[in-house]
Every structure is written in structure tokens, then in C-alpha cells.
A protein has these predicted regions:
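N-terminal periplasmic/intermembrane-space "pro-region" immediately following the signal or transit peptide
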Residues: 11, 20-90
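Surface-exposed extracellular loop regions of Gram-negative outer-membrane beta-barrel proteins
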Residues: 162-169, 173, 330
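Phosphate/ribose-recognition catalytic cores of enzymes acting on nucleotide-derived substrates
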Residues: 144
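Signature for the C-terminal beta-barrel architecture of outer-membrane proteins
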Residues: 59-95, 105-115, 120-131, 135-138, ...
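Sec-dependent signal peptide recognition
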Residues: 3-10
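A short acidic, glycine/proline-enriched capping/turn motif at secondary-structure boundaries
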Residues: 120, 154, 163-165
Length: 330
């Protein structure tokens, strides 16, 4: 299918709210006014605290109302027939995915929303086939919303967020608008840092699906121990890390419950994944190793077309070197 026109617009605007109201110092009295001041008033003035006079001459501190930033992005395509390939125009002659994002920050507090609008989802994106869900406009189009408090050694987030444990083999929640992909998590997350030696994350959330959430529950934790910081290695960075994620199904899938007698395995409502990692860095050299294990889960065997129920595991090893004008990764 030939795409005649593709419009991609990214518009960002940042508004800085100082909300500062300056208060001018009280002007000094002129000579005529000074002459009218009685000796009694002068005597009273002599008894005043000189510090209070100094404060009254200073302007009040300016008030900070925070920082507001926003962006708007639209990916719009108009489709035309292509006689060479035989491609025809879909039911809707155009597709359009639109995103409006606003973020507000005041000190350690932050909050944000993301509004999405799909009058006709783009062909070839994951939303295709779910037009009946995407089309139109309602409160469900407010897909991302969060509030967060970030302190020096901890943070708390409630709402929708993105997260990744390790390399992302057992947990990765991310967004790619060009691909039309978003599997953010809606729930709560807490992070902490103890003297740059121990860092951790814990979360409980529901994964996003279309404009809503799945009933599947995700609970997990990630912990990192910096051995180099603990023993005072300045040039080397060595850390030991681990993660665990539990995926809990509120209800077993219908394809299993309706045809239970056709399967020779008992599908569990809980699937646990875990990983252990070692990271090492020295100047330009870096090396990472991760092992991942997974409890029994079902997947479709592409060779036989049958459902298979078994444990899983994976290993990932990366090594690289970064020089002044080059980098090598394997």
C-alpha cells in the first residue's frame, strides 16, 4: 500500500512558572515629612529593634509556582490506491495517532498526564483491529496519569509509569509511539538508595492494554548491591544485582478453561520469573552477565502449533570497550 502523505509533527512547549511577585521597599520620607515628625515619635523609633527595620526595607522572597512542560505529537497518514502492487485503500482513507503530554514539577513533587486520541488508528500498529475501542473520545483517552515524590534517597510514584529490571528480560514497560506500542504499568512503585551501596525498587501494578488495563497483576522487586562502593574501589565499578517478578492471573484464560480436558497440564495462576546479574566497569571496559529463570508457563510451539507447558531460562552476556573515538560491543 502506497502511503501518499505522512505527517509527523512534534511540538514541544515549556512554560516556566515563577509566579514571582516582587515587593518594592518602602520609599524614604522626604524632607517635609521628616520635619512633621514629633519628638515623641522619634523617641519611639529609637526603641525599635534595628533588625526589624532592616527586614522591612528588604523585598519579600519571590514565590515559585513550579515548572510546567508539555509536548504534542501527531502521526497522520493519508492512504491512496497503488496500481502497481494492487493495494487498496482501507475502510478509512487515513490513519492518525495523536499524543498530548503535560508534566508539572514543584520541588520534589511531580505530576503528569498523557492524552491519546486515535480517530482512526494507523494501519500496521498494534491498535489495528481494535478500532471499536480506539475511535471516539472519552475519559479513557487519558491513558497516562501519575503523581510522584522524589527525595534524596527514595521516591514514591502512584499512577502510570515505565520500568525495566536489568536488561528487560523479565520486566520491561516502555513506549514507542512510532510503532504504536505502549505497555506501561498502572499501580505504585517505591525506589530507595542507601549510601549509593544498596539500591532497590518494588512495585505492584496492572499492565496497560489498549486504553485500559488487563486484570493480570504484576508484583516485583529489584535489588542492586555496589561492591565497589562498599569496599572503596574508586576506578572500578562492580555490582551484584537480582530481580523477581510474579505475574498473577485473576482468571485463567478462556481457551484453557473451556477446553480443560484437552490439555494434559494444570495451568497455574502465578508465573514467577527471577534473574541474577553481575556488572563490571573499568575505565572504557564494560562487561555484563545475566541469568534468567522462569517457572512453568505455557507458550505456543511454532513448529507443531501446540501449546507447551514448561520451565524457561535464558542467559545474556555483553562485553564492550569505549575509546576516545570508537566503541566495540559484543
Amino acid at each position: 500500500m502506497k502511503r501518499l502523505l505522512r505527517i509527523t509533527v512534534l511540538f514541544s512547549v515549556t512554560l516556566l512558572w515563577w509566579g514571582e511577585k516582587g515587593y518594592a521597599a518602602t520609599p524614604a520620607m522626604d524632607a517635609a515629612e521628616k520635619e512633621t515628625v514629633s519628638a515623641t515619635v522619634e523617641a519611639e523609633a529609637d526603641k525599635k529593634d534595628p533588625k526589624s527595620d532592616k527586614k522591612s526595607d528588604e523585598p519579600k522572597r519571590k514565590r515559585n509556582l513550579g515548572h510546567l512542560s508539555g509536548s504534542f505529537e501527531t502521526n497522520t497518514i493519508y492512504y491512496v490506491e497503488d496500481s502497481k502492487t494492487g493495494a487498496v485503500v482501507p475502510h478509512n482513507s487515513y490513519g492518525s495517532n495523536n499524543f498530548l503530554k503535560l508534566d508539572y514539577q514543584l520541588g520534589r513533587f511531580s505530576a503528569g498526564v498523557q492524552l491519546e486520541y486515535y480517530p482512526h488508528p494507523l494501519v500496521g500498529t498494534p491498535m489495528q483491529g481494535y478500532e471499536y475501542v480506539m475511535e471516539g473520545f472519552s475519559i479513557n483517552n487519558l491513558t497516562e496519569k501519575y503523581i510522584s515524590w522524589t527525595d534524596r534517597n527514595y521516591s514514591v510514584t502512584v499512577g502510570d509509569f515505565y520500568e525495566q529490571f536489568g536488561s528487560g528480560l523479565i520486566l520491561r514497560a516502555w513506549e514507542d509511539r512510532a510503532l504504536g506500542f505502549n505497555n506501561s504499568l498502572g499501580g505504585a512503585r517505591v525506589t530507595f538508595n542507601i549510601k549509593d551501596i544498596v539500591e532497590g525498587k518494588v512495585l505492584y501494578a496492572f499492565p496497560r492494554f489498549n486504553l485500559g488495563y488487563l486484570s493480570t497483576q504484576i508484583a516485583g522487586g529489584d535489588l542492586s548491591f555496589s561492591l565497589s562502593n562498599a569496599i572503596g574501589l574508586l576506578d572500578h565499578r562492580l555490582s551484584l544485582e537480582g530481580s523477581i517478578v510474579n505475574r498473577h492471573f485473576k482468571n485463567l484464560p478462556s481457551w484453557y478453561t473451556e477446553y480443560r480436558d484437552d490439555y494434559d497440564f494444570d495451568l497455574s495462576k502465578n508465573v514467577i520469573s527471577y534473574s541474577g546479574r553481575v556488572n563490571y566497569e573499568y575505565r572504557g571496559l564494560s562487561a555484563k552477565f545475566e541469568y534468567v529463570g522462569k517457572s512453568k508457563d505455557v507458550y505456543l510451539d511454532n513448529m507443531t502449533g501446540e501449546e507447551v507447558f514448561k520451565r524457561g531460562d535464558a542467559q545474556l552476556f555483553e562485553i564492550g570497550y569505549t575509546g576516545s573515538n570508537y566503541a566495540v560491543m559484543a
